[in-house]
Amino acid sequence: MLNADYGEGDNLSANAGRFSEIITGYDKNGNIEGLKRSGKSSSTTYGMIDNLTLTYDGNQLKNVTDAATDPLYNGVFNFVDENKGSGTEYLYDSNGNMQQDYNKKISKIQYTLLYLPTTLQFTNGNRKDYTYSADGRKLKVVHKTAIANISVPMGQIKELAASQVSQTHTVDYCGNVIYENGSLNKVLTEEGYATLSGTTPTFYYYLKDHQGNNRIVVRLNGTSWNTEQVNHYYPFGGVFEVNTETSGKQPYKYNGKELDRMHGLDWYDYGARMMDAALGRWHVVDPLAEKYYSISPYVYCGNNPVR
């Protein structure tokens, strides 16, 4: 992919370019070298929210710089150049798994033998702990939010005392049944999901596009339908700021995958590994990399996300 031009109306001339995404270059292995993204820059204006330059050490991401001004609009899906440095911002282990991210302030990620994250630690004390079955199915995630003024050095993981945790959010995955903080949250179905209030179920249904992206979520209300969520996407899965949501957060979005936005992570969980939609790449080597010698093992879907 090179250009994804946004427009509305029959000839796409209305609001042209509001949510366009342009790839300005690739290296010989297919790694993205430049990316420009437009979006909502304030509550009333639109413009460029990302102007990224990516540099590599082989196929491993080394540094990302952003020449655009970060948007003022709250909740914008964009790349945040927190480090604003020219040195190495991403560090990897000997198996090619990203361990440190200076822009997301990830001090360290620990992995299982299947290269799935078990602990993801942020420098401000926030962390995520994952539990899997023996075959790699995700069973549980514990999101911990630290109190203010906690500092974790890069390369380290810190066990917080109970008094240092301001909030804990636990999600259990029991097949198609999802529990949050010990209470039943939803039951996933082929068409969407159901929630329970007492013994009364409420059914929600997805309207998908040709890629399996959940575009609209509707709720069955007696004999009528209520629109609960509308999603629009950038080519690599970033979400538009004009998306609407009326009944709490429904995280299954691009390709029907779960988007984790807590603590600013903004990664999609594809099961075998997680995808960074802001950069259009994985941070873990493709388990089937030996079948695709001609392209980087970190590239997402051969750089053709809309086919």
Predicted regions and their residues:
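Primarily recognizes Gram-negative and organellar outer-membrane beta-barrels
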Residues: 5-12, 25, 38, 95, ...
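A short glycine-rich beta-turn/N-cap micro-motif
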Residues: 1-11, 20-35, 55-63, 76-77, ...
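A residue-level detector for well-ordered beta-strand positions
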Residues: 23-24, 52-54, 90, 109, ...
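Acidic glycine-/aspartate-rich tracts in secreted/extracellular proteins
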Residues: 6, 38-40, 68, 144-148, ...
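Short, small/polar residue-rich loop motifs at catalytic or cofactor-binding pockets
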Residues: 18-20, 48, 84-86, 103-105, ...
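Short turn/helix-capping motifs enriched in Asx and small/polar residues
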Residues: 222-239, 263, 271-273, 277-307
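Extracellular/periplasmic ectodomains of large secreted or surface enzymes and adhesion receptors
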Residues: 48-92
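A motif-centric feature for acidic-aromatic and gly/ser/thr-rich catalytic loops and repeats
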Residues: 179-185, 190, 195-271
